[in-house]
């Protein structure tokens, strides 16, 4: 799907499973943004199937859900197109990044009370949160610069972090696949009940 200006995304269906039972059987419908290879997170549950890997695993149910993958993908492309044209201010973007980064210091009221995010960045609870700082810096230096102050830019900053950022601790890097899955879940949870859901 081409969202314009060569911004192309392709359908991706991923399957995860573990032989030791630590993960359930999981099928995800998503996309890859070709320009940056970000894994794009679908925000609704229609795009995934999850079940414990037991004798009762119902693959027919999984197949029925996956049969709708193209329709879900097409709808998601329409949503992304809307996000490209929907402005988002720095305070709102920063508040969403703070939810993803689990920075409890930032609440809607505090984030909106600051008209300049630069002042928020001086707060110790904020600048110590490496995830929040990485999200914000990537947004400002890359996504906002190239895509404008839009929901699409905010979304792409989050998917960049989920896809490309190293683990915070070097000892956790060997488990980066599980970390990336957890990051995608954090994005889904963080954007619920925000402007992203309203525009979807």
What feature does the model see in each segment?
Residues 3-200:
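Intrinsically disordered, low-complexity regions enriched in serine/threonine
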């Amino acid at each position: 799907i081409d969202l314009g200006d060569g911004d192309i995304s392709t359908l991706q269906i991923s399957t995860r499973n573990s032989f030791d039972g630590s993960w359930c059987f999981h099928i995800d419908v998503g996309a890859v943004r070709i320009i940056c290879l970000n894994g794009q997170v679908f925000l609704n549950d229609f795009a995934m199937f999850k079940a414990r890997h037991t004798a009762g695993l119902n693959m027919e149910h999984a197949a029925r859900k996956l049969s709708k993958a193209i329709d879900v993908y097409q709808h998601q492309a329409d949503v992304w197109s809307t996000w490209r044209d929907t402005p988002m201010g720095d305070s709102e973007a920063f508040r969403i990044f703070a939810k993803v980064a689990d920075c409890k210091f930032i609440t809607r009221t505090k984030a909106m009370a600051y008209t300049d995010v630069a002042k928020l960045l001086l707060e110790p609870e904020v600048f110590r949160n490496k995830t929040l700082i990485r999200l914000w810096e990537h947004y400002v230096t890359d996504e906002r610069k190239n895509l404008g102050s839009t929901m699409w830019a905010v979304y792409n900053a989050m998917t960049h972090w989920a896809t490309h950022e190293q683990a915070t601790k070097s000892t956790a890097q060997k488990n980066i696949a599980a970390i990336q899955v957890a990051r995608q879940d954090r994005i889904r949870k963080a954007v619920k009940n925000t402007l992203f859901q309203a525009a979807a």
